[in-house]
Amino acid sequence: MDPRQSRITELAIAIKKQTETLQSLLDSLKVATPSFSVNANQELPRNAAVQLAQSSILDSCTELQDLVEGPLAHVGRIMSPRVHISSALQAIVHFNIAEKIAKHETISFGEIAKRCKMDVDDVKRIMRLAISYRIFKESHIGFVNHTASSFLIAENLLVRQWISLCCDEFIPAGSFLVPAMKKWPSSEEPNETAFALLHKGDSLWEVLKKQPEKAQRFAHGMEYMRTLPPFDINHLFTSLNWEIDCEMVLVDVGGSQGSIAEALLRRHPRLRCYVQDLPETLSKAVVPKDLKGRLEFVSHSMFKEQPIKADVYLLRSILHDWLDGYALQIIRNLIPALEVGSKVIINEICLPEPNAISAYEAQLIRGYDLSMKQQFNSKERDVHEWETLFRLADRRFKLNRIVNPPGSFLAVLEFEWQPTTP
């Protein structure tokens, strides 16, 4: 870069080049340019080159916006209006606003209020904030249409459940983080959290056990997260690098309603899977017809001794819910079932070193880490913390490999049980 150029000029030039690269890739793949149209694609192709270009653009644009705003406006804008859009989205989902509008319909605020049984002024204020985020559009004064984002909310149950989970539970819990840290400094207990203060002492797990409808919503929310590109199941396939016809028995520990196991089974026709979770989580789990005889749901607490002998034990986004004392219990409960060469595969965020990834990605990953603190008193771990955790659990665990697939937030850490290890 020319040393005489300002940083904002450098970023503008970089964004132009990055955008041209992305457009060229989309043209070569015969994919339409991104747009806000209701008919637009919901995401860019899950192609490594496309995702790299996309990530570069987003990081450059974020930095440029932050610089141009200046620190006074930047800090202010983080708090408002970004905080308030969550309230608008909560109302949009609660009152089924997006679902009440047909895909190509133009509708007045008054008609929306009538269909959703709302005050018309409330509708107008909520909708116009959402519109500023390009969720709906006001085609002419007082009349709105769907955009790509609003129609996604209308047609995708998992998106609505994720919004509801965040707005009803996670975001309100955030306001109790400081009181929880002051009341229970250094606590590892799941009922001494910001979430527990919000829920009169109940941990998130206790709330889910008492309220099946919330357990179902939580399961849907986690399923939505798995649909996002950084959590794509194909990253797991790439990292495992198993032969298609591999013949193994796998236990998916805390596998919820089986979406990961189903994907693995359909990719590997000789694989057999047991999905373990609590009874309330499995209450609505169903084995698909094409997987009968190969997939089984088993009620089991990971805090009890593992009853199933298998070749592989998969823990995907499980241990980050627990600080070390509890995580060690979970790992040690696997040991009675392990045989020489048994694998324990951890599919979790492996926190990068500072400045190793873009600020745009770091905001997401560090946000997940703080969310773990708020909800569970737990955390995301870096590679040294993962190695230390398994060494403390039992020195007979050997770390075979760590894979960080490009474009994925989840690493694969493969530990092998070697009881002869000194």
Curated annotation (Swiss-Prot):
Protein residues bound to S-adenosyl-L-methionine: 277
Loss of function: phenotype: Prevents the conversion of free tyrosine to O-methyltyrosine and, consequently, the synthesis of KK-1. Does not affect the incorporation pattern of unmethylated normal tyrosine by the A domain of the 10th module of kk1B.
Documented EC number(s): 2.1.1.-
Positions annotated as active site in the UniProt record: 320
Keyword Signal: no
Any one Gene Ontology BP term: methylation
Enzyme kind, highest EC tier: transferase
Statement: the UniProt record of this protein carries the keyword Methyltransferase: yes
Molecular function GO labels: O-methyltransferase activity; protein dimerization activity
Record InterPro entries: COMT-like, O_MeTrfase_dom, Plant_O-MeTrfase_dimerisation, SAM-dependent_MTases_sf, WH-like_DNA-bd_sf, WH_DNA-bd_sf
Pfam families: Dimerisation, Methyltransf_2
Pathway the protein takes part in: Secondary metabolite biosynthesis
SUPFAM superfamilies, per the entry: S-adenosyl-L-methionine-dependent methyltransferases, Winged helix' DNA-binding domain
UniProt entry keywords in alphabetical sequence: Methyltransferase, S-adenosyl-L-methionine, Transferase
Record's note on what induces expression: Expression is positively regulated by the KK-1 cluster-specific transcription factor kk1F.
Role: O-methyltransferase; part of the gene cluster that mediates the biosynthesis of KK-1, a novel cyclic depsipeptide with 10 residues which is a promising active compound with high activity against many plant pathogens, especially Botrytis cinerea. Within the pathway, kk1A is responsible for the O-methylation of tyrosine as a free amino acid before its activation as an aminoacyl-AMP by the corresponding A domain of kk1B.
Family, similarity comment: Belongs to the class I-like SAM-binding methyltransferase superfamily. Cation-independent O-methyltransferase family.
Protein name: O-methyltransferase kk1A
Organism, scientific name: Curvularia clavata
